[in-house]
Amino acid sequence: MLGHRLLPSLDFPAVSEGYKPEHDMSPNKDASSLNSSAAGLVCLPPVSEELQLVWTQAIQTSELDGNEHLLQAFSYFPYPSLADIALLCLRHGLQMEKVKTWFMAQRLRCGISWSSEEIEETRARVVYHRDQLLFKSLLSFTQQSVRPPQERPPVLRPEQVALGLSPLAPSEQPTHMKGLKVEPEEPSQVSQLPLNHQNAKEPLMMGSRTFSHQSDCQDLQISGLSKEQAGRGPDQSCGKTASWNHFTAVHQPDKPASVSLLDNSCKEESEPSGIPPSSSTSSPSFQALANGTTATPKPLQPLGCISQSLSPSKKALSPQVEPLWPQRLWNNSEPNSAGPTEYLSPDMQHQRKTKRKTKEQLAILKSFFLQCQWARREDYHKLEQITGLPRPEIIQWFGDTRYALKHGQLKWFRDNAVLGTPSFQDPAIPTPSTRSLKEWAKTPPLPAPPPPPDIRPLEKYWAAHQQLQEADILKLSQASRLSTQQVLDWFDSRLPKPAEVVVCLDEEDEEDEEDELPEDGEEEEEEEEDDDDGDDDVIIWD
């Protein structure tokens, strides 16, 4: 008897493939929405404890739906830690087991199924935006508008337009479903659902801010929520509708078969749709998702297959439909189009150009990582003060280092790790080697780097005087933050180079010297002749 009231587990195809109710996904429902019997039991899959199943009463999963504090916590992050749940219970007088059960039920209602690694990665990204409720679109704090749901005009999603789907008439729209229970009387429906678990990770179309207050739950019925929602932009959150097509074909038997044939005929045309490629880093995309605004779609008309005259880059969108993502994220590949071609804004491009960390900064980060691999918010704040690095770079460094450690690529950690400490810590298990915040508070911050030299005072002085005075050397050295020798060298480089002097001997001087040499020789010859004459004058008498 209990088998008729079971919710599918985490690995059940109905949940893992984006199985969602047709209309009402809001947690503000009666207890009977999960189970028609108050004494019925449901099976909830937790995150930890090796995915063991939790059995609980169906009424406990919805009795806290009116608690605004829990709705606020779920809007901030759908996977709160045990410490966050305990703090909620202490502040608002709640029972911890009921709160944990409530969060499990909300994740199932919204089709959320993340792994533990994805939870930690997304939590590290959401920590920058503590004031923004990124998951508020899944909840509804206000009641539906006065107009009944059956009188509202059906709204087409871009996926429906790309596949040529027409809106359903009020008589053709499916009825409300009672929770997420699966009746065993229809095993063929469950077996026809896709078996690929990766389709459960389709991101939610969060581009429009009207989800949380004005739009009905039909806007959320064709999309699931995954951790890529916080790290990827809205430009990547459309274009895949396999799970929705299966859901439409299985759970709408009264719908004409022409729609299914139309889906198959248009599938080949919608595959080469020009969806902008994702960027290599997730932090800029996350900011674009959190801060970006989107265009409101215009009223649509029933459309068939898109004509072949459209370019392949625009087959996924009709000319009458405005895209749900910002136009600056759309890469228009046609040469004649006038749209922007850059994905990233100047702020995002500036964030990519991060400076290299100094040896002192890396030493402080490594010393903390050796003690604790999962830093808290207070630790990030203190490390930000000590190292002078921005918090996003610190958190990114911790994430990359944990990834390298998990895959055995961290040699310095193995060389310096304390004996007896595990190679990879579980963030939920505190260790005695964790360094407390008081110890880190004693660490003095790194000295600020000296400012770069400024030669503008030297240029002004040179333009005014054109010569360096010895009395002004010290003053110029202080103003330019250069040493006195550097100031002298700078002014020496400005002085004009001395002219080269070439000494040339005149030809007249050379001739005079040549004339003097023969005169000396003639005097010597005259002296020799005089000596000879003296010898001839000697007379010998006998």
From Swiss-Prot:
Compartments where found: Nucleus
Modification Phosphoserine, positions: S345
Pfam annotation, one family: Homez
Residue numbers bearing the Phosphothreonine modification: T443
Extent of Low complexity compositional bias: 272-285
Numbered residues of crosslink Glycyl lysine isopeptide (Lys-Gly) (interchain with G-Cter in SUMO2): K181, K201
Disulfide bond annotation, renumbered to this chain: none
Compositionally biased region (Pro residues): 444-454
Swiss-Prot/TrEMBL keywords: DNA-binding, Homeobox, Isopeptide bond, Nucleus, Phosphoprotein, Repeat, Transcription, Transcription regulation, Ubl conjugation
DNA-binding region (UniProt annotation): 55-114, 349-409, 443-502
One Gene Ontology term, aspect cellular component: nucleus
Region (Disordered) residue spans: 165-193, 250-307, 424-454, 501-542
Start-end of Acidic residues biased regions: 505-542
Motif window: Nuclear localization signal: 352-357
Compositionally biased tracts (Polar residues): 286-296
SUPFAM superfamilies, per database record: Homeodomain-like
Any GO MF annotation of the entry: DNA binding
UniProt xrefs under PROSITE patterns: HOMEOBOX_2
Tissues expressed in: Ubiquitous. Strongly expressed in testis.
Reported function: May function as a transcriptional regulator.
Assembly behavior: Homodimer or heterodimer (Potential). Interacts with HOXC8.
Protein name: Homeobox and leucine zipper protein Homez
Organism: Mus musculus
Gene giving rise to this polypeptide: Homez
